[in-house]
Amino acid sequence: MQNWAVGLGASTMGAELELVYPYSQSMSFRGFYAGGLSQDFNETQGDVDYDIKEKLGGFGALFNYHLFASGWRFSGGVFASDTSITATSTITSATTIGDNDYVTGTIDGSVKFKRKVAPMLSVGYDWQFANGWSVNADLGAIVSGLKATASGSEGIDQVDLNKEIADVQDELDKIPAIPYIAFGVNYRF
């Protein structure tokens, strides 16, 4: 049996670098870092326009069980999130926040994983196509919801902000897990 494998790939959390250690014919341990995926965009929530910056990533540590010592595997472990989503709004005209109208001010918000370290489950397949080389794919979930927070500059009542955040949190609570889809290439040595 060949030992360690190193791999590169892409996932819903960004570009991936992984290291795999096969413990036996049917069991292996896998660690990976995913990151580098970011985007900036605008979104409107209620009357408030936000500039949003999103950066995805984190570290995963998984135990793999290869079904019938085949390419199919079930994986379970943890994902430590390094994901950051920030939102900023600069109010320059009459804008309703909560129950009041504001004409000036700044709102800073963020969305993070509810769990910094969350359970992770996936099913995957490794296809060996040449001596030491394989292609793999995973489909799974990181079991963590998302939590929103916000603060405002002087003059914006936190009670009004809390009402806005409650609306955002209601939408986020509909997401009990973060989808995880990955594809990669490994080399065993």
Regions inferred by a protein language model and the residue ranges of each:
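Residues on the lipid-exposed face of transmembrane beta-strands in outer-membrane beta-barrel proteins
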Residues: L8, L17-Y21, A61-Y65, G76-V78, ...
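Transmembrane beta-strands of outer-membrane beta-barrel pores
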Residues: A10-G14, Y33-Q39, L67, V78-S84, ...
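A membrane-pore/channel beta-structure motif
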Residues: M1-N3, P22, F29, G36-L37, ...
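Solvent-exposed loop/turn segments connecting transmembrane beta-strands
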Residues: A5-Y21, G36, I175
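Extracellular/periplasm-exposed beta-strand and loop segments of Gram-negative cell-envelope proteins
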Residues: Y33-G60, D82-A118, S144-Y180
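A C-terminal functional module that forms or caps the active site or interfaces directly
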Residues: L121, A130-N131, V135-A137, A148-A150
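Outer-envelope beta-barrel architecture signal
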Residues: Q2-W4, A15, Q25-M27, S70-W72, ...
